[in-house]
Amino acid sequence: MEGRRLLHVSRLVLTRVLHLATAALIDGGERYAQRAIREMLAAARFTDWNPSHYLDVAEMTLALAIGYDWLYDQLTEAERDVVATAIIEKGILPSLDPAAVPWWVNSRNNWNQVCHAGLTAGALAVAERDPALAEKIVARAVEKVPLAAGSYAPDGAYVEGTMYWGYGTSFQVMLVDMLEGVLGHDGGLTAAPGFLASAQYILQATGPSGEFFNYADARADRPFAVPLFWFARRMDAPGLLRTDLANLDGALVSIRATPSREVARLFPLALLWWQPEFLERNTAHPETQPLHWLAKGPVPVGVHRSSWGPDAIYIAVNGGCPASPHGHMDGGGFVLEADGVRWAVDPGMQEYHSLEKLGVSLWDRRAEGERWKVFRLGPEGHNILRFDDAPQLPEGATPVVGFRADGDWPHTILDLSALYADQTTCVWRGVALCQGGGVLIQDEWTAREGGDPEVCWQMLTRADVSLEGNNVLLSQSGKKFHLRIQEPTDALIEVIDVSAPVHFYDVPNPGLSKIRVRMRAGSGREGVLRILGATTIAALATNIPTGPLATWA
Protein backbone atom coordinates (compact mmCIF):
# COMPACT_ATOMS: atom_id res chain seq x y z
CA MET A 1 0.00 0.00 0.00
CA GLU A 2 1.05 3.60 -0.64
CA GLY A 3 -0.87 5.47 2.03
CA ARG A 4 -4.50 4.52 1.46
CA ARG A 5 -3.91 3.38 -2.11
CA LEU A 6 -3.11 0.07 -3.79
CA LEU A 7 -3.29 1.81 -7.15
CA HIS A 8 0.38 1.47 -8.04
CA VAL A 9 0.07 -2.32 -7.63
CA SER A 10 -3.10 -2.49 -9.72
CA ARG A 11 -1.43 -0.46 -12.44
CA LEU A 12 1.64 -2.66 -12.39
CA VAL A 13 -0.54 -5.74 -12.85
CA LEU A 14 -2.45 -4.01 -15.67
CA THR A 15 0.79 -2.97 -17.34
CA ARG A 16 2.20 -6.49 -17.23
CA VAL A 17 -0.95 -8.36 -18.21
CA LEU A 18 -1.85 -6.05 -21.10
CA HIS A 19 1.67 -6.02 -22.53
CA LEU A 20 2.22 -9.75 -22.07
CA ALA A 21 -1.19 -10.67 -23.47
CA THR A 22 -0.57 -8.43 -26.48
CA ALA A 23 2.81 -10.04 -27.06
CA ALA A 24 1.24 -13.48 -26.76
CA LEU A 25 -1.37 -12.63 -29.39
CA ILE A 26 1.21 -11.18 -31.78
CA ASP A 27 3.99 -13.70 -31.21
CA GLY A 28 1.97 -16.77 -30.40
CA GLY A 29 4.64 -17.74 -27.89
CA GLU A 30 3.51 -19.57 -24.79
CA ARG A 31 6.03 -17.84 -22.51
CA TYR A 32 4.26 -14.47 -22.66
CA ALA A 33 0.90 -16.05 -21.94
CA GLN A 34 2.19 -18.05 -19.00
CA ARG A 35 3.88 -15.06 -17.41
CA ALA A 36 0.67 -13.05 -17.74
CA ILE A 37 -1.27 -15.89 -16.14
CA ARG A 38 1.14 -15.95 -13.21
CA GLU A 39 0.49 -12.24 -12.66
CA MET A 40 -3.27 -12.78 -12.83
CA LEU A 41 -3.27 -15.67 -10.38
CA ALA A 42 -1.12 -13.75 -7.92
CA ALA A 43 -3.53 -10.79 -8.00
CA ALA A 44 -6.54 -13.09 -7.75
CA ARG A 45 -5.21 -14.44 -4.46
CA PHE A 46 -5.07 -11.01 -2.79
CA THR A 47 -7.40 -10.75 0.20
CA ASP A 48 -9.13 -7.86 -1.58
CA TRP A 49 -8.31 -5.13 -4.10
CA ASN A 50 -8.79 -2.24 -1.68
CA PRO A 51 -12.43 -1.28 -2.27
CA SER A 52 -12.02 1.71 0.04
CA HIS A 53 -10.24 3.33 -2.94
CA TYR A 54 -12.17 1.89 -5.86
CA LEU A 55 -9.84 3.06 -8.62
CA ASP A 56 -7.54 0.30 -7.38
CA VAL A 57 -10.31 -2.26 -7.83
CA ALA A 58 -11.29 -0.94 -11.26
CA GLU A 59 -7.80 -1.13 -12.74
CA MET A 60 -7.18 -4.57 -11.24
CA THR A 61 -10.50 -5.80 -12.59
CA LEU A 62 -9.62 -4.48 -16.04
CA ALA A 63 -6.25 -6.25 -15.90
CA LEU A 64 -7.75 -9.63 -15.07
CA ALA A 65 -10.62 -9.16 -17.51
CA ILE A 66 -8.22 -8.54 -20.39
CA GLY A 67 -6.09 -11.52 -19.44
CA TYR A 68 -9.11 -13.77 -18.97
CA ASP A 69 -10.55 -12.82 -22.35
CA TRP A 70 -7.40 -12.65 -24.47
CA LEU A 71 -5.71 -15.69 -22.95
CA TYR A 72 -8.81 -17.80 -22.41
CA ASP A 73 -7.48 -20.72 -24.45
CA GLN A 74 -4.17 -20.74 -22.57
CA LEU A 75 -5.84 -20.80 -19.14
CA THR A 76 -6.67 -24.16 -17.59
CA GLU A 77 -10.20 -24.70 -16.33
CA ALA A 78 -9.00 -24.34 -12.75
CA GLU A 79 -7.17 -21.09 -13.57
CA ARG A 80 -10.28 -19.72 -15.27
CA ASP A 81 -12.26 -20.43 -12.13
CA VAL A 82 -9.75 -18.63 -9.93
CA VAL A 83 -9.58 -15.55 -12.15
CA ALA A 84 -13.32 -15.34 -12.86
CA THR A 85 -14.18 -15.74 -9.19
CA ALA A 86 -11.79 -12.94 -8.27
CA ILE A 87 -13.27 -10.65 -10.93
CA ILE A 88 -16.76 -11.22 -9.56
CA GLU A 89 -16.08 -11.31 -5.82
CA LYS A 90 -13.24 -8.80 -5.50
CA GLY A 91 -13.99 -6.59 -8.47
CA ILE A 92 -17.73 -6.35 -9.07
CA LEU A 93 -19.70 -7.38 -5.99
CA PRO A 94 -18.20 -4.82 -3.56
CA SER A 95 -19.77 -2.11 -5.73
CA LEU A 96 -23.27 -3.56 -5.36
CA ASP A 97 -23.77 -3.34 -1.62
CA PRO A 98 -27.23 -1.71 -1.34
CA ALA A 99 -26.40 -0.46 2.13
CA ALA A 100 -23.33 1.44 0.96
CA VAL A 101 -23.53 2.51 -2.68
CA PRO A 102 -20.04 3.77 -3.61
CA TRP A 103 -19.94 7.52 -4.14
CA TRP A 104 -18.28 7.19 -7.55
CA VAL A 105 -21.32 5.43 -9.04
CA ASN A 106 -23.05 8.80 -9.40
CA SER A 107 -19.99 11.04 -9.52
CA ARG A 108 -19.22 13.53 -12.26
CA ASN A 109 -15.47 13.06 -12.48
CA ASN A 110 -12.91 10.57 -13.78
CA TRP A 111 -13.69 8.05 -11.01
CA ASN A 112 -17.02 7.43 -12.68
CA GLN A 113 -15.43 6.68 -16.05
CA VAL A 114 -12.61 4.55 -14.67
CA CYS A 115 -14.66 2.48 -12.24
CA HIS A 116 -17.63 1.81 -14.51
CA ALA A 117 -15.34 0.91 -17.42
CA GLY A 118 -13.15 -1.40 -15.35
CA LEU A 119 -16.10 -3.25 -13.85
CA THR A 120 -17.86 -3.47 -17.21
CA ALA A 121 -14.75 -5.13 -18.62
CA GLY A 122 -14.89 -7.66 -15.82
CA ALA A 123 -18.62 -8.26 -16.21
CA LEU A 124 -18.39 -8.82 -19.96
CA ALA A 125 -15.37 -11.10 -19.61
CA VAL A 126 -17.23 -13.48 -17.29
CA ALA A 127 -20.73 -12.92 -18.69
CA GLU A 128 -21.20 -16.59 -19.52
CA ARG A 129 -20.88 -17.42 -15.81
CA ASP A 130 -23.39 -14.83 -14.60
CA PRO A 131 -25.36 -13.20 -17.44
CA ALA A 132 -27.68 -11.35 -15.05
CA LEU A 133 -24.76 -9.75 -13.24
CA ALA A 134 -23.17 -8.71 -16.53
CA GLU A 135 -26.43 -7.16 -17.70
CA LYS A 136 -26.76 -5.25 -14.45
CA ILE A 137 -23.22 -3.83 -14.56
CA VAL A 138 -23.48 -2.84 -18.23
CA ALA A 139 -26.85 -1.16 -17.69
CA ARG A 140 -25.47 0.75 -14.72
CA ALA A 141 -22.48 1.97 -16.72
CA VAL A 142 -24.60 3.10 -19.67
CA GLU A 143 -26.88 4.99 -17.27
CA LYS A 144 -24.21 6.55 -15.06
CA VAL A 145 -21.20 7.35 -17.27
CA PRO A 146 -23.05 10.23 -19.00
CA LEU A 147 -22.91 12.02 -15.64
CA ALA A 148 -19.13 12.22 -15.97
CA ALA A 149 -19.25 12.75 -19.72
CA GLY A 150 -20.69 16.16 -18.93
CA SER A 151 -17.07 17.10 -18.15
CA TYR A 152 -16.49 17.51 -21.91
CA ALA A 153 -19.43 19.83 -22.58
CA PRO A 154 -19.95 21.87 -24.56
CA ASP A 155 -16.76 22.14 -26.63
CA GLY A 156 -14.33 19.48 -25.40
CA ALA A 157 -12.30 21.15 -22.63
CA TYR A 158 -12.19 18.53 -19.87
CA VAL A 159 -13.09 20.05 -16.50
CA GLU A 160 -10.24 18.26 -14.69
CA GLY A 161 -7.51 19.39 -17.06
CA THR A 162 -5.25 17.77 -19.62
CA MET A 163 -3.73 15.02 -17.48
CA TYR A 164 -7.04 13.74 -16.15
CA TRP A 165 -8.48 13.94 -19.65
CA GLY A 166 -5.99 11.18 -20.45
CA TYR A 167 -7.12 9.08 -17.49
CA GLY A 168 -10.88 9.43 -17.73
CA THR A 169 -10.99 9.41 -21.51
CA SER A 170 -8.80 6.31 -21.83
CA PHE A 171 -11.35 4.36 -19.84
CA GLN A 172 -14.33 5.88 -21.61
CA VAL A 173 -13.04 4.93 -25.07
CA MET A 174 -12.27 1.42 -23.80
CA LEU A 175 -15.83 1.23 -22.51
CA VAL A 176 -17.18 2.32 -25.89
CA ASP A 177 -15.07 -0.32 -27.65
CA MET A 178 -16.27 -3.01 -25.23
CA LEU A 179 -19.92 -2.12 -25.70
CA GLU A 180 -19.65 -1.96 -29.47
CA GLY A 181 -17.59 -5.13 -29.71
CA VAL A 182 -19.85 -7.24 -27.50
CA LEU A 183 -23.27 -5.61 -27.74
CA GLY A 184 -23.06 -3.80 -31.06
CA HIS A 185 -23.78 -0.32 -29.68
CA ASP A 186 -22.04 2.33 -27.59
CA GLY A 187 -24.92 3.16 -25.28
CA GLY A 188 -24.95 6.70 -26.66
CA LEU A 189 -21.65 7.52 -24.97
CA THR A 190 -19.94 8.98 -28.04
CA ALA A 191 -22.84 11.38 -28.54
CA ALA A 192 -22.10 13.22 -25.30
CA PRO A 193 -21.64 16.94 -26.07
CA GLY A 194 -17.97 17.79 -26.47
CA PHE A 195 -16.73 14.20 -26.18
CA LEU A 196 -15.42 13.82 -29.73
CA ALA A 197 -14.33 17.48 -29.74
CA SER A 198 -12.05 16.75 -26.79
CA ALA A 199 -9.48 15.32 -29.19
CA GLN A 200 -9.08 18.84 -30.58
CA TYR A 201 -8.78 20.08 -26.99
CA ILE A 202 -5.69 17.95 -26.41
CA LEU A 203 -4.22 19.08 -29.72
CA GLN A 204 -4.74 22.73 -28.79
CA ALA A 205 -3.57 22.31 -25.19
CA THR A 206 -0.21 21.04 -26.46
CA GLY A 207 2.14 23.98 -26.93
CA PRO A 208 4.74 24.33 -29.70
CA SER A 209 7.35 23.06 -27.22
CA GLY A 210 5.40 19.81 -26.90
CA GLU A 211 4.43 20.60 -23.31
CA PHE A 212 0.88 20.63 -21.99
CA PHE A 213 -1.05 23.68 -20.92
CA ASN A 214 -1.04 22.19 -17.45
CA TYR A 215 -3.68 24.06 -15.52
CA ALA A 216 -5.43 22.20 -12.66
CA ASP A 217 -3.86 18.91 -11.49
CA ALA A 218 -1.54 18.29 -14.42
CA ARG A 219 2.12 18.06 -15.31
CA ALA A 220 3.69 20.00 -18.17
CA ASP A 221 5.30 16.84 -19.55
CA ARG A 222 2.82 15.56 -22.11
CA PRO A 223 2.53 11.76 -22.00
CA PHE A 224 1.95 9.56 -25.01
CA ALA A 225 -1.76 10.11 -25.71
CA VAL A 226 -3.11 6.60 -26.30
CA PRO A 227 -6.77 7.73 -26.52
CA LEU A 228 -5.97 9.93 -29.52
CA PHE A 229 -5.41 6.77 -31.55
CA TRP A 230 -9.01 5.83 -30.85
CA PHE A 231 -10.25 9.31 -31.81
CA ALA A 232 -8.11 9.37 -34.96
CA ARG A 233 -9.62 6.09 -36.11
CA ARG A 234 -13.13 7.05 -35.09
CA MET A 235 -13.07 10.40 -36.88
CA ASP A 236 -10.66 9.45 -39.67
CA ALA A 237 -8.39 12.25 -38.47
CA PRO A 238 -4.72 11.21 -38.65
CA GLY A 239 -3.64 14.78 -37.97
CA LEU A 240 -4.53 14.19 -34.33
CA LEU A 241 -1.54 11.86 -34.08
CA ARG A 242 1.11 14.21 -35.39
CA THR A 243 2.65 14.97 -31.99
CA ASP A 244 2.59 11.40 -30.72
CA LEU A 245 4.03 9.90 -33.90
CA ALA A 246 6.75 12.55 -34.06
CA ASN A 247 7.70 11.88 -30.44
CA LEU A 248 7.32 8.11 -30.49
CA ASP A 249 11.03 7.36 -30.09
CA GLY A 250 11.28 9.78 -27.18
CA ALA A 251 8.19 8.29 -25.59
CA LEU A 252 9.69 4.82 -25.74
CA VAL A 253 12.89 6.07 -24.11
CA SER A 254 10.82 7.64 -21.33
CA ILE A 255 8.80 4.47 -20.87
CA ARG A 256 11.93 2.33 -20.55
CA ALA A 257 13.37 4.77 -18.01
CA THR A 258 10.31 4.50 -15.76
CA PRO A 259 10.73 1.48 -13.46
CA SER A 260 7.03 0.72 -12.99
CA ARG A 261 6.17 1.56 -16.61
CA GLU A 262 2.70 2.48 -15.38
CA VAL A 263 2.87 5.71 -17.39
CA ALA A 264 2.42 3.55 -20.48
CA ARG A 265 0.26 0.80 -19.09
CA LEU A 266 -2.27 1.20 -21.93
CA PHE A 267 0.32 1.63 -24.69
CA PRO A 268 -0.60 -1.61 -26.53
CA LEU A 269 -4.08 -0.24 -27.18
CA ALA A 270 -2.53 2.25 -29.59
CA LEU A 271 -1.57 -0.75 -31.73
CA LEU A 272 -5.17 -1.95 -31.77
CA TRP A 273 -6.50 1.45 -32.81
CA TRP A 274 -3.71 2.29 -35.25
CA GLN A 275 -4.56 2.53 -38.94
CA PRO A 276 -1.47 1.86 -41.13
CA GLU A 277 -2.61 4.27 -43.84
CA PHE A 278 -2.39 7.09 -41.30
CA LEU A 279 1.40 7.01 -41.53
CA GLU A 280 1.31 8.60 -44.97
CA ARG A 281 -1.59 10.91 -44.22
CA ASN A 282 -0.78 12.29 -40.78
CA THR A 283 1.53 15.07 -42.04
CA ALA A 284 -1.10 16.46 -44.38
CA HIS A 285 -3.44 17.83 -41.73
CA PRO A 286 -1.76 20.12 -39.15
CA GLU A 287 -2.03 23.31 -41.18
CA THR A 288 -5.79 22.83 -41.41
CA GLN A 289 -6.17 22.92 -37.64
CA PRO A 290 -7.33 26.27 -36.19
CA LEU A 291 -4.73 28.67 -34.83
CA HIS A 292 -7.24 30.22 -32.44
CA TRP A 293 -9.52 28.00 -30.44
CA LEU A 294 -12.05 28.40 -27.66
CA ALA A 295 -13.88 25.90 -25.49
CA LYS A 296 -16.60 27.21 -23.23
CA GLY A 297 -17.80 25.34 -20.16
CA PRO A 298 -17.21 25.23 -16.40
CA VAL A 299 -13.46 25.58 -17.02
CA PRO A 300 -13.21 27.52 -20.29
CA VAL A 301 -9.98 27.47 -22.27
CA GLY A 302 -8.78 29.90 -24.94
CA VAL A 303 -5.75 29.18 -27.12
CA HIS A 304 -3.94 31.42 -29.62
CA ARG A 305 -0.86 30.54 -31.67
CA SER A 306 0.92 32.20 -34.57
CA SER A 307 1.49 28.94 -36.45
CA TRP A 308 1.76 25.17 -35.95
CA GLY A 309 5.56 25.35 -36.08
CA PRO A 310 7.84 24.63 -33.10
CA ASP A 311 8.89 28.29 -32.74
CA ALA A 312 5.37 29.73 -32.77
CA ILE A 313 4.10 32.28 -30.30
CA TYR A 314 1.54 30.54 -28.12
CA ILE A 315 -0.63 31.80 -25.30
CA ALA A 316 -3.32 29.76 -23.57
CA VAL A 317 -5.61 30.92 -20.76
CA ASN A 318 -8.11 29.12 -18.55
CA GLY A 319 -11.05 30.09 -16.41
CA GLY A 320 -12.79 27.88 -13.90
CA CYS A 321 -13.22 27.92 -10.15
CA PRO A 322 -10.73 26.30 -7.76
CA ALA A 323 -13.38 24.00 -6.28
CA SER A 324 -13.75 22.15 -9.60
CA PRO A 325 -12.57 18.52 -9.56
CA HIS A 326 -8.76 18.56 -9.37
CA GLY A 327 -8.91 22.35 -9.54
CA HIS A 328 -6.14 24.73 -8.57
CA MET A 329 -6.42 28.39 -7.61
CA ASP A 330 -5.58 29.31 -11.19
CA GLY A 331 -8.62 31.08 -12.65
CA GLY A 332 -7.27 33.37 -15.37
CA GLY A 333 -3.96 31.51 -15.39
CA PHE A 334 -1.94 31.33 -18.58
CA VAL A 335 1.16 29.84 -20.17
CA LEU A 336 3.20 31.63 -22.82
CA GLU A 337 5.68 30.27 -25.37
CA ALA A 338 7.83 31.74 -28.14
CA ASP A 339 10.92 30.53 -30.00
CA GLY A 340 10.46 27.05 -28.54
CA VAL A 341 10.73 28.28 -24.93
CA ARG A 342 7.97 28.32 -22.33
CA TRP A 343 8.40 31.75 -20.77
CA ALA A 344 5.36 31.76 -18.48
CA VAL A 345 5.06 28.43 -16.70
CA ASP A 346 2.71 26.58 -14.41
CA PRO A 347 4.84 24.52 -11.99
CA GLY A 348 2.27 21.71 -12.14
CA MET A 349 0.63 19.47 -9.61
CA GLN A 350 2.25 18.00 -6.51
CA GLU A 351 1.84 14.25 -6.03
CA TYR A 352 -0.98 13.48 -3.62
CA HIS A 353 0.82 10.94 -1.48
CA SER A 354 3.65 13.38 -0.73
CA LEU A 355 1.06 15.67 0.87
CA GLU A 356 -1.28 13.14 2.44
CA LYS A 357 1.51 11.32 4.26
CA LEU A 358 2.37 14.62 5.98
CA GLY A 359 -1.20 15.12 7.12
CA VAL A 360 -2.23 17.82 4.63
CA SER A 361 -6.00 18.01 4.23
CA LEU A 362 -5.69 17.87 0.47
CA TRP A 363 -9.37 17.70 -0.45
CA ASP A 364 -10.62 20.52 1.75
CA ARG A 365 -11.72 22.99 -0.91
CA ARG A 366 -13.19 25.59 1.42
CA ALA A 367 -11.80 29.11 1.09
CA GLU A 368 -9.73 28.59 4.24
CA GLY A 369 -8.83 25.00 3.32
CA GLU A 370 -5.29 23.70 3.69
CA ARG A 371 -5.28 22.70 0.02
CA TRP A 372 -4.81 26.33 -1.00
CA LYS A 373 -1.76 26.78 1.20
CA VAL A 374 0.19 24.27 -0.92
CA PHE A 375 2.39 26.35 -3.24
CA ARG A 376 1.60 24.46 -6.43
CA LEU A 377 -2.14 24.26 -5.78
CA GLY A 378 -2.91 27.66 -4.28
CA PRO A 379 -2.58 31.20 -5.59
CA GLU A 380 1.17 31.50 -5.05
CA GLY A 381 1.97 29.03 -7.80
CA HIS A 382 -0.03 30.47 -10.70
CA ASN A 383 -0.01 33.27 -13.26
CA ILE A 384 -3.02 35.12 -11.91
CA LEU A 385 -4.22 38.47 -10.62
CA ARG A 386 -4.50 38.98 -6.85
CA PHE A 387 -5.84 41.64 -4.51
CA ASP A 388 -3.98 42.21 -1.22
CA ASP A 389 -2.29 38.83 -1.81
CA ALA A 390 -5.57 37.14 -0.90
CA PRO A 391 -6.54 33.78 -2.40
CA GLN A 392 -9.22 33.51 -5.04
CA LEU A 393 -12.68 32.48 -3.87
CA PRO A 394 -13.12 28.75 -4.51
CA GLU A 395 -16.64 28.91 -5.98
CA GLY A 396 -18.15 30.73 -8.93
CA ALA A 397 -18.46 30.74 -12.71
CA THR A 398 -15.91 32.43 -14.99
CA PRO A 399 -17.69 32.89 -18.31
CA VAL A 400 -16.11 33.81 -21.62
CA VAL A 401 -17.23 37.33 -22.52
CA GLY A 402 -15.21 37.76 -25.69
CA PHE A 403 -13.42 35.68 -28.30
CA ARG A 404 -12.16 36.40 -31.78
CA ALA A 405 -10.21 34.16 -34.13
CA ASP A 406 -9.48 36.73 -36.87
CA GLY A 407 -8.46 40.34 -37.32
CA ASP A 408 -5.30 42.04 -36.09
CA TRP A 409 -5.55 40.69 -32.55
CA PRO A 410 -7.31 37.37 -32.03
CA HIS A 411 -8.21 37.22 -28.35
CA THR A 412 -10.01 35.61 -25.43
CA ILE A 413 -11.66 37.58 -22.61
CA LEU A 414 -12.79 35.99 -19.34
CA ASP A 415 -15.01 37.41 -16.62
CA LEU A 416 -13.26 36.43 -13.38
CA SER A 417 -15.43 38.55 -11.09
CA ALA A 418 -16.73 35.61 -9.06
CA LEU A 419 -13.20 34.70 -7.95
CA TYR A 420 -12.64 38.14 -6.40
CA ALA A 421 -16.17 39.11 -5.33
CA ASP A 422 -15.10 39.81 -1.74
CA GLN A 423 -12.90 42.73 -2.85
CA THR A 424 -14.13 43.81 -6.28
CA THR A 425 -17.33 44.20 -8.24
CA CYS A 426 -15.82 43.26 -11.60
CA VAL A 427 -12.60 41.64 -12.87
CA TRP A 428 -11.92 40.82 -16.52
CA ARG A 429 -8.79 39.36 -18.09
CA GLY A 430 -8.10 39.48 -21.81
CA VAL A 431 -5.24 37.89 -23.74
CA ALA A 432 -4.51 38.83 -27.35
CA LEU A 433 -2.09 37.54 -29.96
CA CYS A 434 -1.14 40.50 -32.10
CA GLN A 435 -0.33 40.17 -35.79
CA GLY A 436 2.87 42.13 -35.27
CA GLY A 437 4.29 39.25 -33.26
CA GLY A 438 3.46 40.30 -29.72
CA VAL A 439 1.01 39.32 -27.02
CA LEU A 440 -1.04 41.50 -24.72
CA ILE A 441 -2.42 40.57 -21.31
CA GLN A 442 -4.91 43.17 -20.13
CA ASP A 443 -6.62 43.11 -16.74
CA GLU A 444 -9.47 45.40 -15.72
CA TRP A 445 -11.19 45.65 -12.33
CA THR A 446 -13.43 47.78 -10.16
CA ALA A 447 -12.63 47.72 -6.45
CA ARG A 448 -15.46 47.84 -3.93
CA GLU A 449 -16.34 51.18 -2.36
CA GLY A 450 -14.36 51.80 0.79
CA GLY A 451 -11.57 49.44 -0.20
CA ASP A 452 -8.24 50.18 -1.82
CA PRO A 453 -6.55 46.78 -2.17
CA GLU A 454 -3.12 46.34 -3.64
CA VAL A 455 -3.31 44.71 -7.05
CA CYS A 456 -0.65 42.12 -7.86
CA TRP A 457 -0.10 40.62 -11.31
CA GLN A 458 2.14 37.58 -11.08
CA MET A 459 3.92 35.38 -13.60
CA LEU A 460 6.17 32.39 -12.94
CA THR A 461 9.18 31.70 -15.14
CA ARG A 462 12.33 29.60 -15.27
CA ALA A 463 14.14 32.23 -17.30
CA ASP A 464 16.79 34.61 -16.02
CA VAL A 465 15.09 37.93 -15.31
CA SER A 466 16.46 41.47 -15.51
CA LEU A 467 14.56 44.71 -14.90
CA GLU A 468 14.99 48.14 -16.46
CA GLY A 469 12.32 50.73 -15.82
CA ASN A 470 8.99 49.31 -16.91
CA ASN A 471 10.69 46.63 -19.04
CA VAL A 472 11.46 43.04 -18.10
CA LEU A 473 13.95 40.94 -20.07
CA LEU A 474 13.71 37.15 -19.90
CA SER A 475 16.66 35.02 -21.07
CA GLN A 476 16.64 31.25 -21.43
CA SER A 477 18.29 28.66 -23.70
CA GLY A 478 20.01 31.41 -25.69
CA LYS A 479 16.67 33.09 -26.44
CA LYS A 480 15.16 36.35 -25.18
CA PHE A 481 11.66 37.55 -24.47
CA HIS A 482 10.62 41.09 -23.57
CA LEU A 483 7.81 42.21 -21.28
CA ARG A 484 6.68 45.82 -21.00
CA ILE A 485 4.27 47.20 -18.45
CA GLN A 486 2.52 49.68 -20.72
CA GLU A 487 -0.11 50.84 -18.25
CA PRO A 488 0.26 52.07 -15.58
CA THR A 489 3.81 53.33 -16.04
CA ASP A 490 4.41 53.76 -12.31
CA ALA A 491 3.70 50.18 -11.21
CA LEU A 492 6.23 48.48 -8.94
CA ILE A 493 8.00 45.51 -10.57
CA GLU A 494 9.87 42.91 -8.54
CA VAL A 495 11.34 39.45 -9.01
CA ILE A 496 11.25 36.81 -6.27
CA ASP A 497 13.09 33.50 -6.12
CA VAL A 498 10.46 30.84 -5.38
CA SER A 499 12.63 27.78 -5.96
CA ALA A 500 12.76 26.76 -2.28
CA PRO A 501 9.78 25.12 -0.56
CA VAL A 502 7.55 27.58 1.30
CA HIS A 503 6.16 25.02 3.77
CA PHE A 504 7.52 21.70 5.01
CA TYR A 505 5.06 19.86 2.76
CA ASP A 506 5.90 21.78 -0.44
CA VAL A 507 8.30 20.38 -3.02
CA PRO A 508 11.20 22.40 -4.47
CA ASN A 509 10.76 24.28 -7.75
CA PRO A 510 14.28 24.43 -9.19
CA GLY A 511 15.04 27.59 -11.15
CA LEU A 512 11.60 29.10 -10.64
CA SER A 513 11.13 32.85 -10.21
CA LYS A 514 8.02 34.97 -9.81
CA ILE A 515 7.60 38.34 -11.52
CA ARG A 516 5.21 40.59 -9.61
CA VAL A 517 3.72 43.86 -10.83
CA ARG A 518 2.08 45.84 -8.01
CA MET A 519 -0.19 48.89 -7.85
CA ARG A 520 -3.13 50.24 -5.84
CA ALA A 521 -6.65 49.41 -6.99
CA GLY A 522 -8.33 52.60 -5.79
CA SER A 523 -11.62 52.68 -3.88
CA GLY A 524 -14.57 52.22 -6.20
CA ARG A 525 -12.43 53.05 -9.22
CA GLU A 526 -11.95 51.20 -12.46
CA GLY A 527 -8.38 50.04 -12.93
CA VAL A 528 -6.41 48.62 -15.82
CA LEU A 529 -3.09 46.83 -16.21
CA ARG A 530 -1.65 46.24 -19.70
CA ILE A 531 1.42 44.05 -20.14
CA LEU A 532 2.94 43.43 -23.57
CA GLY A 533 5.25 40.59 -24.52
CA ALA A 534 7.33 39.81 -27.61
CA THR A 535 10.62 38.33 -28.75
CA THR A 536 11.76 41.74 -30.09
CA ILE A 537 11.39 45.30 -28.85
CA ALA A 538 9.86 46.35 -32.17
CA ALA A 539 7.04 43.84 -31.87
CA LEU A 540 5.95 45.37 -28.57
CA ALA A 541 4.46 48.34 -30.40
CA THR A 542 3.04 46.72 -33.53
CA ASN A 543 -0.71 46.16 -34.08
CA ILE A 544 -1.52 46.29 -30.38
CA PRO A 545 -5.20 46.61 -29.38
CA THR A 546 -6.15 49.76 -27.54
CA GLY A 547 -9.03 50.68 -25.30
CA PRO A 548 -11.09 48.71 -22.79
CA LEU A 549 -11.64 44.98 -23.20
CA ALA A 550 -15.30 45.58 -23.98
CA THR A 551 -14.24 47.34 -27.20
CA TRP A 552 -12.03 44.53 -28.51
CA ALA A 553 -14.75 43.12 -30.77
Q: Model-predicted segments: where are they?
A:
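Beta-sandwich/jelly-roll carbohydrate-recognition scaffolds of carbohydrate-active enzymes
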Residues: 1-4, 290-293, 298-301, 440-441, ...
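Aromatic-lined, polymer-binding surfaces characteristic
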Residues: 2-212, 218-219, 428
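Histidine-centered active-site/metal-ligand motif
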Residues: 56, 111, 164, 325-331, ...
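A residue-level signal for conserved active-site and pocket-lining positions in enzyme catalytic cores
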Residues: 64, 119, 304, 443, ...
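Replace the tail clause
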Residues: 74-77, 293, 474
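Carbohydrate-active enzyme catalytic cores, enriched for enzymes
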Residues: 103, 126, 167-344, 402-409, ...
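CBM-like, beta-strand-rich accessory domains located in the C-terminal region of large
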Residues: 249-258, 262, 354-553
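Terminal accessory carbohydrate-recognition/targeting modules of carbohydrate-active enzymes
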Residues: 306-379, 527, 533
